[in-house]
């Protein structure tokens, strides 16, 4: 099973909006070198909402190719039409992903019954492990632990990414879903506590720019060393909040560009590049997190 420090990878782009595959390859190498445990390709942070399906599949496939078996790649397969999610899932099943991460259908606000039916239909279209993804702040639907529990019996649904920031859900999910069901935090600010309470890993935005420290924090928390985990995590807490001074992934892309990790900080409309009033805030947070900028 995939656990530990997982990066929600940005999708680097050229100034004309095309995907910058040279920078993508460098990012994959960077995370392998820094010890990251797995990569999520083309999730929320990877701008899945603005990549058409053929481009989405290509970016995931290239990420798998660059990884070359050295680090697991999880492909984002979420959509708000079940038929589209199934089509995407079938395409991703052919490119070598270790698992897929499917966000709850957004905007159309399905009922719990609809969520269960959606995920069962998607899971039935592939043998690849599936991870549920709950982020109500973006989707307008909250998949409660009781709904997640209805999907535990589906053999290739292996876990959930819980991005509400409500760490009380760790205990409830564990009670309802059992010890073998994987629980991933999707909220950097509460990730340490999430792991110490019994979570298995973190799918992280900050991990794009502080992978070594984030890996060390995750390892310490998973080992039950709360003191060590806190000593690593506390200096990063200002960074966690500042990376959401505007909608993700606007700030983290800007930061990655300032670090020289990607050639260009371009982001696709309707998102725009980081506002000037946030530049100083983010630079200050990066400095306090001991991140070198160029």
UniProtKB/Swiss-Prot annotation:
Alphabetized CDD domains for the sequence: DHDPS
Name used for this protein in its record: 4-hydroxy-tetrahydrodipicolinate synthase
Subcellular location: Cytoplasm
Pfam families, per the entry: DHDPS
Source lineage: Bacteria, Pseudomonadati, Pseudomonadota, Gammaproteobacteria, Alteromonadales
Gene that produces this protein: dapA
Source taxon at top rank: Bacteria
Catalysed reactions listed for this entry: L-aspartate 4-semialdehyde + pyruvate = (2S,4S)-4-hydroxy-2,3,4,5-tetrahydrodipicolinate + H2O + H(+)
SMART domains from the UniProt entry: DHDPS
Purpose: Catalyzes the condensation of (S)-aspartate-beta-semialdehyde [(S)-ASA] and pyruvate to 4-hydroxy-tetrahydrodipicolinate (HTPA).
């Amino acid at each position: 099973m995939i656990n530990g420090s997982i990066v929600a990878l940005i999708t680097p782009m050229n100034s004309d909006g095309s995907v910058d595959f040279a920078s993508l390859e460098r990012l994959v190498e960077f995370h392998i070198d820094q010890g990251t445990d797995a990569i999520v390709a083309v999730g929320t942070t990877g701008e899945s909402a603005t990549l058409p399906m053929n481009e989405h599949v290509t970016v995931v496939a290239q990420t798998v190719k660059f990884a070359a078996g050295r680090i697991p790649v999880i492909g984002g397969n979420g959509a708000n039409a079940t038929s589209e999610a199934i089509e995407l899932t079938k395409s991703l099943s052919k490119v070598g992903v270790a698992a897929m991460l499917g966000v709850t259908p957004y905007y159309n606000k399905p009922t719990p019954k609809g969520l269960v039916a959606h995920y069962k239909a998607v899971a039935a279209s592939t043998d690849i492990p599936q991870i549920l993804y709950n982020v109500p702040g973006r989707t307008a639907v909250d998949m409660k632990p009781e709904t997640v529990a209805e999907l535990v019996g589906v053999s290739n649904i292996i876990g959930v990414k819980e991005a509400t920031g409500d760490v009380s859900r760790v205990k409830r999910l564990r009670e309802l879903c059992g010890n073998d069901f994987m629980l991933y935090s999707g909220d950097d600010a509460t990730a340490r506590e999430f792991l110490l309470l019994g979570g298995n890993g973190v799918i992280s935005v900050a991990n794009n720019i502080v992978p070594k420290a984030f890996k060390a924090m995750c390892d310490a928390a998973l080992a039950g060393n709360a003191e060590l985990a806190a000593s690593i995590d506390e200096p990063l807490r200002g960074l966690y909040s500042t990376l959401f001074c505007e909608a993700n992934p606007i700030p983290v892309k800007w930061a990655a560009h300032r670090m020289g990790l990607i050639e260009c900080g371009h982001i696709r409309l309707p998102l725009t590049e980081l506002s000037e009033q946030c530049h100083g805030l983010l630079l200050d947070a990066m400095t306090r997190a001991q991140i070198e900028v160029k």
